Structure formats: C-alpha cells, structure tokens
C-alpha cells in the first residue's frame, strides 16, 4: 500500500464530481491510500497569478504545509494542479525570499509554515505508470475499454520534473494506460496544446478556437472519445465544445471525459 496526501484540485468536487466518484475506488483497488489534505484551498488555477503572483504562491504554500503535516507526498488527478504545485515547489526551492514571504503570511493567518525540502507532487497518471505499474492495472481490468481514445494532456504538467518519467515533449503515459485498459489510443497533433482555460473570461473567442482545434483534431484522427488528464481543461473540452465549434466553425462533437 502506497500512501499519498490527496489534493482534489479546483473542480473535482464542484463541476466534475465523476473524478471524485472514481478516484477513491480506483485507488483502493490498486493499493493507493489517500490521506486528504484537510482544509485545502484552491491553487489559484493560474488565474489569480495573472493579478497577484505572490497570492497564488502563498495559496500553494498553505496546501504544501498541510500536506507536510500529513507526512506524505502529494497526489492529484488534475494536470493543472500538478503543474501549479510543481512550479510553486520549484519557485520556493530556488527563491528563499519567496518562501519566506509566503511563510510570513501563513504564520500570521494560519499558524503554519511550509518547509518544501522533501515533499513532492505527482499526477495520478504518473503514479499509476511509474509506481503501481501497468501490469497491475491491466490485471485489475474487468470490462476492457475497447474504444478509440484520444488522450489530452494539457500543457501544465508537460515540463521537466512535473511529468514523472514521461517525455515532456512527446508524452505517451496516457496512451500506455489506455492500452492497459483495453483501449486503442489515437495519435493527433494537438494532444499537448493548451485550451486556454485560465483565459476563458478574458479571451473568450481565442480560447474557443484553441479548444475547437483540440476537439476537431481528435475527431478527425478517428477518436470515439477524448480523455483529459486535466480536470480544469475538461470544462473547455466538454461544457464549451458546442460554443467552440460555432466560434471556430469546426466539428467539435465528441464525448469528453476526465
């Protein structure tokens, strides 16, 4: 049994309840014990960062400090959360002043501080492939997927250090996982492109065109469904796919799931 501090991210318990409904039994089946980060807060979603970088860093320092109290490394099912947490850890380790400033706020408001010297953060995908092993995943399959699946990574965790042992430039962990589940991964050119979720309210049409490109590319490549490693980006791919298709004048009609 491997143990992790579980960070749900911004939407797993809001607009994407299916993530919470599936991650708990999945982890139990595969021997991953989740210890919730009690009292966790939003990581800022790279939206707060646009107006106040220090505030977003402090929000992440608080989550890190709470996870350190649990005594376990962090796991999340959201690529955005993984990328943001990793970036915060990297910033704090390279910039002691940034860490000191965040800890000053935390000490005054919460009575806690973050150390950041040992803790790590991982996406569930990387834990399944790197630590649990795809053989164990395959052995646990009851109903093989048997579908043509387009994998959407999102850009946040596709950077050195944030993507586990995967290739940051040409990732393939999701494709390997899909094959272990009995599905057929479909290659398409925009699988690591951004859909612009943090700019959804400020750059609406541009974001819709970015979203439409991903959906249309996946559909043209023959995918029956698109699976997102990012719960935040999933809202674009699912809830906004009709609008994205109209704005970009492209066929975007494809089921999108987390």
Regions found by a protein language model. Give the residues of each.
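Iron-sulfur cluster-binding electron-transfer modules in prokaryotic oxidoreductases
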Residues: 1-258
């Amino acid at each position: 049994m491997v143990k992790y501090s579980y960070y749900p991210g911004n939407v797993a318990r809001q607009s994407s309840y299916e993530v919470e409904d599936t991650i708990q039994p999945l982890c139990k089946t595969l021997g991953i014990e989740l210890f919730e980060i009690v009292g966790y807060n939003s990581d800022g979603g790279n939206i707060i960062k646009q107006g106040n970088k220090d505030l977003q860093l402090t929000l992440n320092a608080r989550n890190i400090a709470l996870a350190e109290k649990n005594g376990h490394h962090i796991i999340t099912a959201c690529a955005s959360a993984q990328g943001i947490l990793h970036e915060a850890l990297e910033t704090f380790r390279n910039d002691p002043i940034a860490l000191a400033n965040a800890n000053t706020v935390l000490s005054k408001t919460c009575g806690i501080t973050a150390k950041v010297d040992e803790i790590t953060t991982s996406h569930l995908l990387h834990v399944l492939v790197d630590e649990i092993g795809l053989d164990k995943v395959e052995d646990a399959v009851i109903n093989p997927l048997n579908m043509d699946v387009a994998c959407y990574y999102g850009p946040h965790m596709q950077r050195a250090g944030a993507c586990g042992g995967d290739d940051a430039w040409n990732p393939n962990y999701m494709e390997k996982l899909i094959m272990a589940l009995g599905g057929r991964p479909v290659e398409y050119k925009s699988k690591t492109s951004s859909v612009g979720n943090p700019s959804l309210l400020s750059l609406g049409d541009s974001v819709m065109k970015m979203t439409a490109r991903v959906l249309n590319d996946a559909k043209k490549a023959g995918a029956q469904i698109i699976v997102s490693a990012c719960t935040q980006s999933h809202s674009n791919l699912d809830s906004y796919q009709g609008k994205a298709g109209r704005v970009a004048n492209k066929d975007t009609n494809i089921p999108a799931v987390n």
